[in-house]
Amino acid sequence: MGSQKNYLSDDSTGGGFGVLFKWTKDALFGSRITPSRKYKEFAQDDTNYKIKRSVGKSAVGRRSRSNSWSGLDSSFYQKYDLLEDEDEDDDEKVFGMPSHLVGSGGSRSCNGDDIVGKAVPFGLDSQRRKRLQSLLDPVDLHPMREDVDTFANNLKFHNTSKLDSFDDLMQTPRQDKEFISKLFGKDTGNEPEPMSYRQFPGKFPSPGKNPTSSTKIKQVDHTDEYLQLLDKLDKNSKMIDSLNREVQNKKQQTKLQESNYKNKYMQTRNELINELRHSKKLYDNYYKLFQKYQQLKIISKESLELQNRIPTLDDRLVNETLVKDRKINELQKRIQSLQIANENLTTQREIDILKYESRIKELEAKLILQNDVHSQFHHSTSTYNNNNEFLNTDYDIDTLDTSFSRHLNINNTNYKP
């Protein structure tokens, strides 16, 4: 299919003779490059290329003067099977190094006697390298399935990737149309046409056979298949429409489901929020009760400790009461003894007082008697002076009182309960 067609299936060439005629005409008039001419030109190009690379390696490299052919597009060379002028600095532009440092590892190696395996420059683009390698291949210059008819290719050249117009679709398809042949799974280009006696040299028509029937080419009509294909396309379009409707219905159903799910989600969310609030209240109450429980636990622990201390305190209290009772008894005994001593002292003091009073009375009586006696024998003045001197020397009331008080103080200090 495409570029790989059998040359016998070409209607414009007239079969194998047409191909031979084209090759002969191209070889004589030079309108088409024949395989032998391509090989000769390749040999010359290879020689020029090697010379050019050897010159490019020298320090002083020459560059050809630019002409009107140097600015042409690559499509022009591809259209007429021409080789583009190579630039000696292509390798430096591609790899950033001199051309003599670029190896031949990227070139396609050939078997044995390949004279161009190391001559293809690595710096060229892939399309130019493939085209140059196909031209320089000495093993198979033109495959059998490659169409070399220039005029037929120019007539049939069109972009098969683009869809034809509606008028072309409604027409009966051609036998060699690539789109139809791919749809039906048939390779029309590979099917050889029935050959007639006119295609062979020295062949004459047989008198018993109808020359028109033998030379008539069988035409296959694909109209029914084409209509069936259109019916299938129509059915497929209807199925696509139904699928679109189903998809739209499913989208609407999914939207309704999403809205229902959203409402249910909001309901469950509100319920969850309420439950969370209720659980928060429960937790707060539980926390308060737990704190109270901790406090009661501490109080109970303290109460147990106090209860454990009660027996010891009772024992201590009993001991202290006993000690206090003993002290009280001792104090009471001491009080009694002191009271007895006090009574004794009071009685003794009273006795002493009575003694002192009686003594004082005696002394006063003596004094009176002495005063009466002196008054009789002496004058009043002299008796008075003598009485004063006697009082001053023999008896003094102040000294008597002080001695009595001193005696009382000594008795009080000596008494110890």
Swiss-Prot record:
Record localization: Cytoplasm, Cytoskeleton, Microtubule organizing center, Spindle pole body
Disulphide bridges, residue numbers: none
This protein's GO CC annotations: cytoplasm; spindle pole body
Major localisation: cytoplasm
Record's keyword annotation contains Cytoplasm: yes
Alphabetic keyword roster: Coiled coil, Cytoplasm, Cytoskeleton
InterPro entries named in the record: Bbp1_C, Bbp1_N
Family: Belongs to the BBP1 family.
Oligomeric form and interacting partners: Homodimer.
Protein's name in the database: Spindle pole component BBP1
